[in-house]
Amino acid sequence: MNKSALVTGASRGIGRSIALQLAEEGYNVAVNYAGSKDKAEAVVEEIKAKGVESFAIQANVAKGDEVKEMIKEVVSQFGSVDVLVNNAGITKDNLLMRMKEQEWDDVIDTNLKGVFNCIQKVTPQMLRQRSGAIINLTSIVGAMGNPGQANYVATKAGVIGLTKTAARELASRGITVNAVAPGFIVSDMTNALSDDLKDQMLEQIPLKRFGEDTDIANTVAFLASDKAKYITGQTIHVNGGMYM
């Protein structure tokens, strides 16, 4: 394989796992980060150990000019962007009545405008090659809602709508656009929960376990592959049955 992928927010967590899984599948991977250069470089070394090419690139996805330069650099180094994974995201939680306008704007800018920027800037290159796969990370809360996360939920619901619209616009050129919606995934946050709270959360999950980063990474890798070339405009829920 001589294909390349760009994963945003890939210096840790789910983004890191996605980048490593795509490398395992044979993709050259560009590791985008916002501020964690050392962590991003560590991921690059893990990827290179799998026998593919990789480099770290800093860009704030909320800024269109930075995204444009990022795409240009990835194409310069790899020759193309065959797969774009929009994973970068932030949270600034607060109750709706207490949420500051800046908290709303910051999350919207990164989580929703950032996805728009990356899709818009990568599309010309994918149109020229008449192929490509775009996978957007959304969330179970984009479908269910969640108290204290009005800004985050709005972005994740917006990503689902943006995914469907982009899929309709780009399908005729051989470009697929899908979303992956994680449920509760093991993280530092879930590890810090009390056993009682963990049990309460697990009661809502028919499969009776929290998800792993690899559950998400494997789903993204499938959607990026030729095995999923007849799938577009879909949101794949990976949540152990918590939302059906």
UniProtKB/Swiss-Prot annotation:
Residues the record lists as binding NADP(+): 9-12, 60-61, 87, 152-156, 185
Any one biological process term the GO annotation gives: fatty acid elongation
SMART domains recorded: PKS_KR (SM00822)
Major enzyme class: oxidoreductase
Keyword Cell membrane: no
Record: active site: 152
Matching SUPFAM superfamilies: NAD(P)-binding Rossmann-fold domains
Key words, A-Z: Fatty acid biosynthesis, Fatty acid metabolism, Lipid biosynthesis, Lipid metabolism, NADP, Oxidoreductase
One function term, GO molecular function aspect: NADP binding
Keyword Nucleotide-binding annotated: no
Family per similarity comment: Belongs to the short-chain dehydrogenases/reductases (SDR) family.
Function: Catalyzes the NADPH-dependent reduction of beta-ketoacyl-ACP substrates to beta-hydroxyacyl-ACP products, the first reductive step in the elongation cycle of fatty acid biosynthesis.
Identification of the protein by name: 3-oxoacyl-[acyl-carrier-protein] reductase FabG
Organism expressing this protein natively: Staphylococcus epidermidis (strain ATCC 35984 / DSM 28319 / BCRC 17069 / CCUG 31568 / BM 3577 / RP62A)
